Amino acid sequence: STAQNTLVSLERPFQTPLCPAAQPRHLGCRPSLTATPPELTGQRFTTYGASGGIHFGVDLSAPCGTEIVAVADGIVFAVDGPFGSPPHNLMVDHPQLGYASMYGHLLQAPNLLPGQVVKQGEVIALTGDTAETCYGRPHLHLEIRDLNHVTKYNPAMLINANWHNLALTGSTARDFARNLEAPRQWQSLYDQPEARTGGPIINDFAYVWPFDWRKKEDTRPLTPVSLIGSDLPEIQAASSTGPLVASPAGRQVMGGDCCTQPYWNKDSTQVRFLDRPDAGSPLGIWGVDVGQPETGPQFITERLGIYSPDNAYIAYPDQSKGVTVIERMADGQTWEIDTQERSPNFTPDSKGILWTAYDDDAPSDNREETLWLADVDGSNPRLLLKDRRSDPVAWLAGNKMLLARRVPGSSDQTLFILSLSDGRQTELLQLPQMRSLALSDDRRYLVYYVSLQPDSSENGTWLLDLQSAKPQPQKLPFFGAYRWRDNERLIYVPMDPNATEHSFFEYNARTGQSRSLFPGGTGLTIANNDWRISPDGTKIALVAASGIKLDGLWVLDIKD
C-alpha cells in the first residue's frame, strides 16, 4: 500500500477543518470538490461566474453549530470580508506556507479580529447554512487560496486526508461534467483545476457531457464532428497504458486514467464507458470484454444521448429550440417534445418520458417543481404533480411512482406513492432527510442514509420494506457506499477515513446476515466511489486509484 500511504504523506500542510473528527458522530462528511458536477453546469456563468465557472472549494456537510478548527497556524485577515459564502465568512492567512484558508457559510461572525494569531486545531468558527435555516443545506465551504486571495487551489491536494475514503457514501459516484474534446480531463477528486477570481470561465466547454438541455443561440452540433469516425464496423483502440495487472481479488481490464462512470452491458460480458482512448481513436462509447481484456477496448457507437431501457430510442436536445428530440433507432425517425429545457428520463417500459420543470432562479430550498409525463411519441403530455421540493425516487410496479417531499420548515421528508393513472397520493411515513435512496431490483426494499441529525441515533444507513403493511425503518450495521446486487442482497463498502484498501461486504435484507465478499482483501482503492455491479450479480466493476492518480478499470468476480 505504498502508493496509498503517499496520500497523506505528500506536501499537504493542512489538517481537515472538521472531518473526520466530526464524521463518526454526524455521518455527514461527503466532500463536494472543485470543478463542475453535472447538476451545476448551468451555474458556471451565474453562481460561480466570478471564479472561473467552477465550484472552487470543498463542501463538508455538518449540522449547524459544529466546531470548525484552523487548518494550520495563521493570522486572521478578515471576518465577513468580500469573499462570498454568506451569511458569514472568515479568511485566515498562512504566510509561512504561502496560502490562505477561507471558511464560508458560517453560523455567525467569528469572534476574531484581523491580525489575531490562531493555531492549527484551534476552534475558530461554527458551521452554518446557506439558506440560514439550519435545515436547508448546512455545511462548511472551505477554500484554499494564495496570499493575494485571488487564486483558488484544489483542497484535496493540500489537506491531509484521503478523499477517496471520504467519498464512500451512498449509492452513486462522485462524477463531473466532461469536456468532450478531452473526455478524461478533470475526472477525479485529485485532478481538479485552479481558478482565479475574475478569471476566465475555464469550464465553458464547446462540447459538454451530459448535454445541456437549455436553449442556446449557438447551433453547433452536440459533439465535435472532427473526433467522430465510425466508418468501420469495428474499431479497436491501441492497448491501454502498460500491461494489465491483477490484485488479490480481481483483474485490471483497462489501465491509466481511463473509464470513469462505467456501466455494464445487459448480458454482463462487457463494461462500457465514454472515452477517446488515444489520438487516433474516435470519441464515443467504448466497451471492454471482461473475459478477454487483453484484446483492448472495442468501439461501440458515436451516438451520445439518453437511451431508453430497451435501446429502441435515444433522446438528445435541440439546443436551438430548447426541446428534446426522440429518435427511433430502428429507422432514424425523429420527433420533438417540449420538455421545458429539461433532460427527460424514459419510463421503465420505454413507452413514456418523464421530466421535472422548475425556475432556475428560484431558491432551491423552496422552489415550485412540476412533474410531467408524456407518451414516448410526444402525445398525451400531462402534469402529474405540482409541488415544492418533491423529488422522484423510483418507479414502482402497477403504474406508480415513489417520491419524497420535504416537510415545510424542516429537513424531514414524507415518503409517498403517486398513482400515474389517477394522481392519487398515498403517504407512507415521515422520516429524517433521506439521502442517496436506492431500491432493490424487485422494488421491495429501499435503502438510504441519514446524516446531520442532532440525535445521533437517527444517523446511519437504513432499510425500509415497502411491502410491509406499516413500513418501519430498520437500521443497518454499516455506514458507507452501497449498491443492490439483486432483490435482497446489498453490497456495501464501509466508509473508513483511515482505510488503506477498500473492502466489499454483502448484506442480506431478508436474513439480516452480512458476509465479506473478499476475505483475503482486495488490494484496491475505489476512486470517486465509482463502482457498478453487473446485471447478473456476479461481478463488480470499479475505477481504481493509486495514490492521487487513477489506476484504470478493474473487475472483481463475486463468489457465492
Tell where the protein language model's regions lie, with residue ranges.
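Blade-level signature of beta-propeller repeat domains, shared across WD40, Kelch, NHL, RCC1
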Residues: 527-560
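Conserved strand-loop elements at the edges of beta-sheets that form or border functional pockets
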Residues: 62, 70, 94, 105, ...
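Conserved, short, structured surface segments that act as functional micro-motifs
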Residues: 90-91, 116-194
